[in-house]
Protein backbone atom coordinates (compact mmCIF):
# COMPACT_ATOMS: atom_id res chain seq x y z
CA UNK A 1 0.00 0.00 0.00
CA UNK A 2 1.40 3.41 -0.96
CA UNK A 3 1.15 6.54 1.18
CA UNK A 4 -1.57 8.97 0.23
CA UNK A 5 -1.02 12.74 0.48
CA UNK A 6 -2.56 13.07 3.95
CA UNK A 7 -0.55 10.15 5.32
CA UNK A 8 2.63 11.57 3.82
CA UNK A 9 2.06 14.98 5.45
CA UNK A 10 1.23 13.32 8.78
CA UNK A 11 4.25 11.06 8.55
CA UNK A 12 6.53 13.93 7.64
CA UNK A 13 5.39 15.87 10.69
CA UNK A 14 5.76 12.88 12.98
CA UNK A 15 9.19 12.11 11.60
CA UNK A 16 10.39 15.68 12.13
CA UNK A 17 9.15 15.59 15.72
CA UNK A 18 10.67 12.17 16.37
CA UNK A 19 14.01 12.73 14.62
CA UNK A 20 12.81 11.37 11.26
CA UNK A 21 12.36 7.80 12.45
CA UNK A 22 10.16 5.76 14.75
CA UNK A 23 11.61 4.46 18.02
CA UNK A 24 12.81 1.18 16.55
CA UNK A 25 14.71 2.99 13.83
CA UNK A 26 16.21 5.50 16.24
CA UNK A 27 17.64 2.68 18.32
CA UNK A 28 19.82 1.60 15.39
CA UNK A 29 21.62 4.95 15.58
CA UNK A 30 22.69 4.32 19.19
CA UNK A 31 24.54 1.02 19.12
CA UNK A 32 24.73 -1.00 22.30
CA UNK A 33 27.52 -3.25 23.47
CA UNK A 34 26.89 -6.84 22.39
CA UNK A 35 25.26 -8.78 25.25
CA UNK A 36 27.12 -12.05 25.82
CA UNK A 37 24.88 -14.83 27.18
CA UNK A 38 26.28 -16.46 30.32
CA UNK A 39 28.23 -19.68 29.78
CA UNK A 40 27.05 -22.92 31.41
CA UNK A 41 29.56 -25.78 31.20
CA UNK A 42 29.00 -29.42 31.96
CA UNK A 43 30.74 -30.63 35.12
CA UNK A 44 30.95 -34.23 36.25
CA UNK A 45 28.04 -35.00 38.56
CA UNK A 46 26.50 -31.53 38.33
CA UNK A 47 23.22 -30.94 36.46
CA UNK A 48 22.58 -28.02 34.13
CA UNK A 49 19.44 -26.00 34.87
CA UNK A 50 17.35 -24.25 32.20
CA UNK A 51 14.28 -22.52 33.65
CA UNK A 52 11.68 -21.02 31.31
CA UNK A 53 10.15 -17.99 33.03
CA UNK A 54 9.04 -14.41 32.57
CA UNK A 55 11.73 -11.74 32.70
CA UNK A 56 12.34 -8.16 31.57
CA UNK A 57 14.49 -6.96 28.67
CA UNK A 58 15.15 -3.72 26.77
CA UNK A 59 15.08 -4.21 23.00
CA UNK A 60 15.26 -0.44 22.38
CA UNK A 61 17.34 1.83 24.59
CA UNK A 62 16.66 1.50 28.32
CA UNK A 63 12.93 0.82 28.07
CA UNK A 64 12.36 -2.67 29.48
CA UNK A 65 9.38 -4.83 28.65
CA UNK A 66 8.06 -8.15 29.97
CA UNK A 67 9.28 -11.10 27.90
CA UNK A 68 9.77 -14.83 28.09
CA UNK A 69 13.27 -15.87 28.99
CA UNK A 70 15.49 -18.62 30.30
CA UNK A 71 17.25 -18.36 33.65
CA UNK A 72 15.96 -14.83 34.14
CA UNK A 73 17.05 -13.15 30.89
CA UNK A 74 15.97 -12.86 27.27
CA UNK A 75 17.52 -15.78 25.35
CA UNK A 76 19.12 -18.56 27.31
CA UNK A 77 22.69 -19.12 28.48
CA UNK A 78 25.18 -20.72 26.13
CA UNK A 79 25.65 -24.36 27.16
CA UNK A 80 29.02 -25.98 26.45
CA UNK A 81 29.45 -29.75 26.69
CA UNK A 82 32.13 -32.19 25.62
CA UNK A 83 32.15 -35.37 23.55
CA UNK A 84 31.97 -38.27 26.00
CA UNK A 85 30.00 -36.39 28.67
CA UNK A 86 26.74 -37.64 30.15
CA UNK A 87 24.88 -34.44 30.91
CA UNK A 88 21.93 -34.24 33.27
CA UNK A 89 19.75 -31.39 32.07
CA UNK A 90 16.85 -30.07 34.14
CA UNK A 91 14.22 -28.10 32.22
CA UNK A 92 11.76 -26.26 34.49
CA UNK A 93 8.63 -24.58 33.15
CA UNK A 94 7.65 -21.54 35.21
CA UNK A 95 5.43 -20.08 32.49
CA UNK A 96 1.65 -20.28 32.44
CA UNK A 97 1.32 -22.62 29.45
CA UNK A 98 2.80 -25.97 28.39
CA UNK A 99 6.17 -25.89 26.65
CA UNK A 100 8.21 -28.54 24.84
CA UNK A 101 11.95 -28.11 24.30
CA UNK A 102 14.49 -29.74 22.00
CA UNK A 103 18.16 -29.32 21.04
CA UNK A 104 18.54 -28.80 17.32
CA UNK A 105 21.56 -30.65 15.94
CA UNK A 106 22.23 -32.80 19.01
CA UNK A 107 22.65 -36.49 18.17
CA UNK A 108 20.58 -38.33 20.80
CA UNK A 109 17.92 -41.10 20.62
CA UNK A 110 14.25 -40.22 20.17
CA UNK A 111 13.29 -40.50 23.88
CA UNK A 112 15.81 -37.74 24.67
CA UNK A 113 14.96 -35.40 21.78
CA UNK A 114 12.07 -33.66 23.55
CA UNK A 115 9.19 -32.20 21.57
CA UNK A 116 5.56 -33.33 21.63
CA UNK A 117 6.28 -36.52 23.60
CA UNK A 118 7.96 -34.52 26.37
CA UNK A 119 5.64 -31.58 26.95
CA UNK A 120 6.38 -29.81 30.23
CA UNK A 121 3.27 -28.57 32.03
CA UNK A 122 3.27 -25.25 33.93
CA UNK A 123 5.19 -25.82 37.14
CA UNK A 124 6.63 -29.08 35.80
CA UNK A 125 10.14 -30.32 35.02
CA UNK A 126 11.84 -32.70 32.60
CA UNK A 127 15.27 -34.10 33.51
CA UNK A 128 16.90 -36.10 30.69
CA UNK A 129 20.44 -37.45 30.92
CA UNK A 130 22.03 -36.74 27.55
CA UNK A 131 24.93 -38.87 26.28
CA UNK A 132 27.16 -36.55 24.23
CA UNK A 133 28.62 -38.74 21.49
CA UNK A 134 29.33 -36.55 18.49
CA UNK A 135 31.91 -34.30 16.90
CA UNK A 136 32.18 -30.63 17.79
CA UNK A 137 29.21 -28.59 16.60
CA UNK A 138 27.25 -25.42 17.26
CA UNK A 139 23.72 -26.61 18.10
CA UNK A 140 20.80 -24.72 19.62
CA UNK A 141 18.09 -25.47 22.13
CA UNK A 142 14.65 -24.05 21.55
CA UNK A 143 10.93 -24.46 22.08
CA UNK A 144 9.38 -27.23 19.99
CA UNK A 145 5.83 -27.05 21.32
CA UNK A 146 3.25 -28.62 18.96
CA UNK A 147 1.42 -25.90 17.00
CA UNK A 148 3.09 -23.21 19.17
CA UNK A 149 6.72 -23.37 18.09
CA UNK A 150 6.60 -20.05 16.21
CA UNK A 151 5.32 -17.84 19.07
CA UNK A 152 7.41 -19.65 21.69
CA UNK A 153 10.66 -19.15 19.78
CA UNK A 154 9.66 -15.57 18.93
CA UNK A 155 9.02 -14.95 22.63
CA UNK A 156 12.61 -15.92 23.47
CA UNK A 157 12.86 -19.64 24.31
CA UNK A 158 16.19 -20.03 22.47
CA UNK A 159 19.85 -20.56 23.34
CA UNK A 160 23.09 -21.95 21.92
CA UNK A 161 24.40 -25.43 22.76
CA UNK A 162 28.07 -26.00 21.93
CA UNK A 163 29.67 -29.43 21.62
CA UNK A 164 33.47 -29.62 21.79
CA UNK A 165 35.72 -32.60 21.09
CA UNK A 166 39.42 -33.40 21.05
CA UNK A 167 39.80 -32.14 17.48
CA UNK A 168 38.18 -28.77 18.09
CA UNK A 169 40.25 -28.26 21.25
CA UNK A 170 43.53 -29.05 19.45
CA UNK A 171 43.06 -26.77 16.43
CA UNK A 172 44.50 -23.22 16.51
CA UNK A 173 41.06 -21.60 16.42
CA UNK A 174 39.78 -18.77 18.66
CA UNK A 175 38.10 -20.44 21.64
CA UNK A 176 37.97 -17.88 24.47
CA UNK A 177 34.24 -17.42 24.96
CA UNK A 178 33.21 -13.77 24.92
CA UNK A 179 36.77 -12.64 24.11
CA UNK A 180 37.57 -13.90 20.61
CA UNK A 181 34.75 -16.47 20.26
CA UNK A 182 31.29 -14.86 20.19
CA UNK A 183 27.75 -16.30 19.95
CA UNK A 184 25.39 -14.34 17.69
CA UNK A 185 21.67 -15.19 17.85
CA UNK A 186 19.99 -13.31 15.01
CA UNK A 187 16.25 -12.57 14.94
CA UNK A 188 13.86 -10.14 13.32
CA UNK A 189 10.98 -8.65 15.27
CA UNK A 190 8.37 -5.95 14.99
CA UNK A 191 8.56 -3.47 17.89
CA UNK A 192 5.97 -0.88 18.81
CA UNK A 193 6.94 2.67 19.79
CA UNK A 194 7.50 1.50 23.36
CA UNK A 195 9.92 -1.25 22.32
CA UNK A 196 7.41 -4.04 22.94
CA UNK A 197 7.60 -6.97 20.47
CA UNK A 198 4.48 -7.51 18.38
CA UNK A 199 3.58 -10.88 16.91
CA UNK A 200 0.67 -11.36 14.53
CA UNK A 201 1.07 -14.60 12.56
CA UNK A 202 0.24 -14.16 8.87
CA UNK A 203 -2.52 -16.19 7.24
CA UNK A 204 0.04 -17.63 4.82
CA UNK A 205 3.82 -17.84 4.76
CA UNK A 206 5.93 -16.93 7.75
CA UNK A 207 6.33 -13.93 10.03
CA UNK A 208 8.87 -11.24 9.17
CA UNK A 209 9.66 -8.16 11.21
CA UNK A 210 11.34 -4.84 10.52
CA UNK A 211 13.81 -4.74 13.43
CA UNK A 212 16.99 -6.83 13.34
CA UNK A 213 18.12 -8.05 16.75
CA UNK A 214 21.39 -9.73 17.70
CA UNK A 215 21.50 -11.29 21.16
CA UNK A 216 18.39 -9.23 21.88
CA UNK A 217 19.63 -5.74 20.89
CA UNK A 218 19.83 -3.67 17.72
CA UNK A 219 23.05 -2.83 15.85
CA UNK A 220 25.47 -3.90 18.61
CA UNK A 221 29.24 -3.50 18.66
CA UNK A 222 31.99 -5.46 20.36
CA UNK A 223 35.60 -4.58 21.09
CA UNK A 224 38.04 -7.29 20.03
CA UNK A 225 41.78 -7.85 20.08
CA UNK A 226 43.67 -7.62 16.81
CA UNK A 227 43.86 -11.07 15.27
CA UNK A 228 41.33 -13.73 14.33
CA UNK A 229 37.78 -13.43 15.68
CA UNK A 230 35.31 -16.33 15.64
CA UNK A 231 31.58 -15.72 15.27
CA UNK A 232 29.09 -18.54 15.89
CA UNK A 233 26.00 -17.56 13.91
CA UNK A 234 22.47 -18.81 14.58
CA UNK A 235 19.44 -17.65 12.61
CA UNK A 236 16.64 -17.90 15.18
CA UNK A 237 14.17 -15.93 13.05
CA UNK A 238 10.76 -17.39 12.30
CA UNK A 239 11.16 -17.32 8.53
CA UNK A 240 13.66 -14.70 7.32
CA UNK A 241 16.85 -15.75 5.55
CA UNK A 242 19.87 -13.46 5.68
CA UNK A 243 22.65 -12.90 3.14
CA UNK A 244 25.57 -11.48 5.09
CA UNK A 245 28.57 -9.43 3.99
CA UNK A 246 31.33 -7.41 5.60
CA UNK A 247 31.02 -3.67 5.10
CA UNK A 248 34.48 -3.22 3.55
CA UNK A 249 34.17 -6.20 1.21
CA UNK A 250 36.77 -8.37 2.92
CA UNK A 251 36.32 -12.14 2.93
CA UNK A 252 34.85 -14.23 5.72
CA UNK A 253 36.33 -17.66 6.35
CA UNK A 254 33.64 -20.27 6.98
CA UNK A 255 34.94 -23.03 9.23
CA UNK A 256 31.80 -24.90 10.34
CA UNK A 257 28.19 -25.60 9.48
CA UNK A 258 25.28 -27.14 11.43
CA UNK A 259 26.93 -30.47 12.26
CA UNK A 260 30.47 -29.29 12.77
CA UNK A 261 33.72 -28.31 11.13
CA UNK A 262 34.13 -28.19 7.36
CA UNK A 263 37.00 -30.17 5.82
CA UNK A 264 38.82 -26.85 5.23
CA UNK A 265 38.11 -23.13 5.71
CA UNK A 266 36.15 -21.58 2.85
CA UNK A 267 36.72 -17.90 2.01
CA UNK A 268 33.48 -16.21 0.89
CA UNK A 269 32.40 -12.61 0.32
CA UNK A 270 28.77 -13.30 1.15
CA UNK A 271 27.13 -15.94 3.27
CA UNK A 272 23.55 -17.23 3.42
CA UNK A 273 22.01 -18.05 6.80
CA UNK A 274 18.56 -19.67 6.71
CA UNK A 275 16.23 -20.07 9.71
CA UNK A 276 17.61 -22.74 12.02
CA UNK A 277 21.01 -22.82 10.31
CA UNK A 278 24.23 -22.37 12.22
CA UNK A 279 27.56 -21.36 10.76
CA UNK A 280 30.92 -20.45 12.23
CA UNK A 281 33.12 -17.84 10.59
CA UNK A 282 36.55 -16.34 11.22
CA UNK A 283 37.29 -12.68 10.52
CA UNK A 284 40.83 -11.31 10.32
CA UNK A 285 41.04 -8.17 12.49
CA UNK A 286 44.84 -7.93 12.43
CA UNK A 287 44.87 -4.77 10.28
CA UNK A 288 43.14 -2.81 13.03
CA UNK A 289 40.26 -1.45 10.96
CA UNK A 290 36.65 -1.44 12.19
CA UNK A 291 34.22 -3.54 10.14
CA UNK A 292 30.49 -4.28 10.28
CA UNK A 293 28.75 -7.54 9.44
CA UNK A 294 25.57 -6.65 7.53
CA UNK A 295 22.50 -8.42 6.14
CA UNK A 296 21.34 -6.74 2.94
CA UNK A 297 19.91 -3.29 2.22
CA UNK A 298 18.19 -1.33 4.98
CA UNK A 299 14.96 0.61 4.58
CA UNK A 300 15.04 4.06 2.97
CA UNK A 301 13.26 7.08 4.40
CA UNK A 302 10.03 6.40 2.47
CA UNK A 303 9.94 2.82 3.76
CA UNK A 304 10.44 4.12 7.30
CA UNK A 305 7.64 6.65 6.91
CA UNK A 306 5.37 3.97 5.50
CA UNK A 307 6.20 1.81 8.52
CA UNK A 308 4.42 4.34 10.75
CA UNK A 309 1.10 3.29 9.19
CA UNK A 310 1.45 -0.35 8.17
CA UNK A 311 3.60 -3.36 9.08
CA UNK A 312 6.80 -3.55 7.04
CA UNK A 313 8.96 -6.51 6.07
CA UNK A 314 11.93 -4.27 5.19
CA UNK A 315 14.58 -4.10 7.90
CA UNK A 316 15.09 -0.62 9.35
CA UNK A 317 18.76 -1.42 9.91
CA UNK A 318 20.73 -4.35 8.55
CA UNK A 319 23.73 -4.03 10.86
CA UNK A 320 24.38 -7.33 12.61
CA UNK A 321 27.58 -6.53 14.50
CA UNK A 322 30.36 -3.94 14.37
CA UNK A 323 33.81 -5.25 15.31
CA UNK A 324 36.09 -2.62 16.87
CA UNK A 325 39.72 -3.76 17.18
CA UNK A 326 41.71 -2.52 20.15
CA UNK A 327 45.28 -2.87 21.37
CA UNK A 328 48.43 -3.89 19.55
CA UNK A 329 48.90 -6.78 17.17
CA UNK A 330 50.34 -9.79 19.05
CA UNK A 331 53.98 -10.59 18.31
CA UNK A 332 52.89 -14.03 17.13
CA UNK A 333 49.59 -14.68 15.37
CA UNK A 334 48.19 -18.05 14.34
CA UNK A 335 47.76 -18.70 10.65
CA UNK A 336 44.42 -20.02 9.46
CA UNK A 337 44.74 -23.83 9.36
CA UNK A 338 44.66 -25.25 5.84
CA UNK A 339 42.76 -28.36 6.93
CA UNK A 340 40.24 -28.89 9.71
CA UNK A 341 38.89 -32.41 9.12
CA UNK A 342 39.13 -35.28 6.69
CA UNK A 343 36.85 -35.06 3.66
CA UNK A 344 33.22 -36.06 4.17
CA UNK A 345 32.69 -39.63 3.00
CA UNK A 346 29.51 -41.66 3.38
CA UNK A 347 30.23 -45.32 3.88
CA UNK A 348 27.89 -47.83 2.28
CA UNK A 349 25.38 -47.56 -0.52
CA UNK A 350 22.25 -45.45 -0.80
CA UNK A 351 19.42 -47.69 0.35
CA UNK A 352 16.53 -45.82 -1.29
CA UNK A 353 15.29 -42.50 -2.68
CA UNK A 354 12.37 -40.50 -1.26
CA UNK A 355 10.68 -37.35 -2.54
CA UNK A 356 8.98 -34.68 -0.47
CA UNK A 357 7.00 -31.61 -1.50
CA UNK A 358 6.65 -28.65 0.80
CA UNK A 359 4.41 -25.76 0.09
CA UNK A 360 2.32 -22.94 1.40
CA UNK A 361 -0.38 -23.43 -1.21
CA UNK A 362 -0.36 -27.22 -0.61
CA UNK A 363 -0.74 -27.78 3.15
CA UNK A 364 1.64 -30.03 5.00
CA UNK A 365 4.25 -32.27 3.39
CA UNK A 366 3.25 -34.31 0.34
CA UNK A 367 -0.26 -33.02 0.97
CA UNK A 368 -0.47 -34.59 4.45
CA UNK A 369 -0.79 -32.58 7.64
CA UNK A 370 1.18 -33.54 10.76
CA UNK A 371 -0.44 -36.47 12.55
CA UNK A 372 1.19 -37.63 15.79
CA UNK A 373 -0.35 -41.10 15.34
CA UNK A 374 1.19 -41.68 11.88
CA UNK A 375 4.70 -42.76 10.88
CA UNK A 376 5.54 -40.87 7.69
CA UNK A 377 9.01 -42.32 7.13
CA UNK A 378 10.39 -45.59 8.47
CA UNK A 379 14.02 -46.58 7.98
CA UNK A 380 16.89 -48.33 9.75
CA UNK A 381 19.76 -47.09 11.86
CA UNK A 382 22.99 -46.61 9.92
CA UNK A 383 21.35 -46.40 6.51
CA UNK A 384 21.91 -43.66 3.96
CA UNK A 385 19.02 -42.42 1.80
CA UNK A 386 18.67 -39.90 -0.99
CA UNK A 387 16.00 -37.31 -0.19
CA UNK A 388 14.79 -35.01 -2.96
CA UNK A 389 12.82 -32.09 -1.54
CA UNK A 390 10.72 -29.61 -3.51
CA UNK A 391 9.42 -26.32 -2.09
CA UNK A 392 6.70 -24.20 -3.71
CA UNK A 393 7.67 -21.32 -1.41
CA UNK A 394 11.36 -20.80 -0.50
CA UNK A 395 11.93 -22.06 3.04
CA UNK A 396 14.36 -23.87 5.30
CA UNK A 397 13.95 -27.54 6.21
CA UNK A 398 15.25 -29.42 9.26
CA UNK A 399 15.56 -33.12 10.13
CA UNK A 400 16.07 -34.36 13.70
CA UNK A 401 18.39 -37.23 14.58
CA UNK A 402 20.35 -37.23 11.31
CA UNK A 403 23.16 -35.54 9.50
CA UNK A 404 23.19 -35.00 5.76
CA UNK A 405 25.25 -33.73 2.87
CA UNK A 406 23.78 -31.43 0.24
CA UNK A 407 24.39 -33.19 -3.06
CA UNK A 408 22.80 -30.56 -5.30
CA UNK A 409 20.59 -27.47 -5.23
CA UNK A 410 18.41 -26.89 -8.29
CA UNK A 411 20.56 -29.34 -10.23
CA UNK A 412 23.82 -27.52 -9.45
CA UNK A 413 26.56 -28.23 -6.92
CA UNK A 414 25.86 -26.67 -3.52
CA UNK A 415 27.49 -23.46 -2.32
CA UNK A 416 30.97 -24.00 -0.90
CA UNK A 417 29.80 -23.16 2.63
CA UNK A 418 27.31 -26.06 2.36
CA UNK A 419 30.04 -28.64 1.79
CA UNK A 420 29.93 -29.95 5.36
CA UNK A 421 27.56 -32.10 7.39
CA UNK A 422 24.24 -30.37 8.01
CA UNK A 423 20.81 -30.85 9.54
CA UNK A 424 19.08 -27.75 8.12
CA UNK A 425 18.99 -26.52 4.52
CA UNK A 426 17.49 -23.65 2.52
CA UNK A 427 15.23 -24.84 -0.31
CA UNK A 428 14.39 -22.57 -3.24
CA UNK A 429 12.76 -25.05 -5.66
CA UNK A 430 14.72 -28.31 -5.22
CA UNK A 431 17.54 -29.85 -3.19
CA UNK A 432 19.01 -33.34 -3.16
CA UNK A 433 20.32 -34.63 0.17
CA UNK A 434 22.26 -37.69 1.24
CA UNK A 435 20.75 -38.41 4.66
CA UNK A 436 22.58 -40.58 7.19
CA UNK A 437 20.47 -41.93 10.07
CA UNK A 438 22.50 -41.60 13.25
CA UNK A 439 20.11 -42.34 16.11
CA UNK A 440 17.12 -44.62 16.84
CA UNK A 441 13.54 -43.41 17.34
CA UNK A 442 10.11 -45.00 17.73
CA UNK A 443 6.40 -44.20 17.41
CA UNK A 444 6.35 -43.26 21.08
CA UNK A 445 9.33 -40.93 20.59
CA UNK A 446 9.66 -40.11 16.88
CA UNK A 447 12.06 -37.71 15.23
CA UNK A 448 10.48 -34.86 13.29
CA UNK A 449 11.31 -33.29 9.95
CA UNK A 450 9.67 -29.98 9.26
CA UNK A 451 9.64 -26.62 7.55
CA UNK A 452 11.85 -24.19 9.42
CA UNK A 453 9.39 -21.46 8.45
CA UNK A 454 7.90 -21.89 11.88
CA UNK A 455 4.36 -20.80 11.06
CA UNK A 456 4.25 -23.43 8.29
CA UNK A 457 5.46 -26.09 10.72
CA UNK A 458 2.76 -25.06 13.19
CA UNK A 459 0.13 -25.33 10.43
CA UNK A 460 1.12 -28.90 9.65
CA UNK A 461 4.29 -28.93 7.50
CA UNK A 462 5.82 -31.55 9.77
CA UNK A 463 6.41 -35.29 9.39
CA UNK A 464 7.42 -38.12 11.72
CA UNK A 465 10.55 -40.22 11.23
CA UNK A 466 10.98 -43.68 12.76
CA UNK A 467 14.55 -45.04 12.76
CA UNK A 468 14.58 -48.69 13.79
CA UNK A 469 17.66 -50.37 15.21
CA UNK A 470 19.18 -52.89 12.81
CA UNK A 471 18.00 -56.45 13.46
Swiss-Prot record:
One GO biological process term: FtsZ-dependent cytokinesis
Compartment(s) where it occurs, according to its Swiss-Prot or TrEMBL record: Periplasm
Keywords: Cell cycle, Cell division, Periplasm, Signal
Main location: periplasm
Matches recorded under InterPro entries: Cu-oxidase-like_N, Cu-oxidase_C, Cu-oxidase_fam, Cupredoxin, FtsP, TAT_signal
GO molecular function, one term: copper ion binding
Keyword Disulfide bond (UniProt): no
Keyword Acyltransferase: no
Signal peptide coordinates: 1-27
Positions of the Plastocyanin-like domain: 229-287
Superkingdom field: Bacteria
One GO cellular component, as annotated: outer membrane-bounded periplasmic space
Protein family according to the UniProt entry: Belongs to the FtsP family.
Role noted for this protein: Cell division protein that is required for growth during stress conditions. May be involved in protecting or stabilizing the divisomal assembly under conditions of stress.
Protein name as it appears in the record: Cell division protein FtsP
Amino acid sequence: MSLNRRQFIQASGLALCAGMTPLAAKASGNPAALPIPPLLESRRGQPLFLTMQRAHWAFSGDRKTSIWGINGRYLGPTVRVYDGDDVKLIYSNRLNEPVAMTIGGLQVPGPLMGGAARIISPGGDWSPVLPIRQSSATCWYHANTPNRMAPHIYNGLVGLWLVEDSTSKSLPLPNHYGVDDFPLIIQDKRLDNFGVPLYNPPSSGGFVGDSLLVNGVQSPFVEVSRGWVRLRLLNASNSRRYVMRLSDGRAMNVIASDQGLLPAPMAVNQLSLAPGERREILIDMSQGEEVTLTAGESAGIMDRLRGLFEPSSILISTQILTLKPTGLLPLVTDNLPMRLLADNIIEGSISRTREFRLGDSLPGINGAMWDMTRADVQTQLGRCERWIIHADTPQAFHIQGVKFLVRSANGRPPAVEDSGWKDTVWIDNDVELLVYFMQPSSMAFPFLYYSQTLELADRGSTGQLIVQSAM
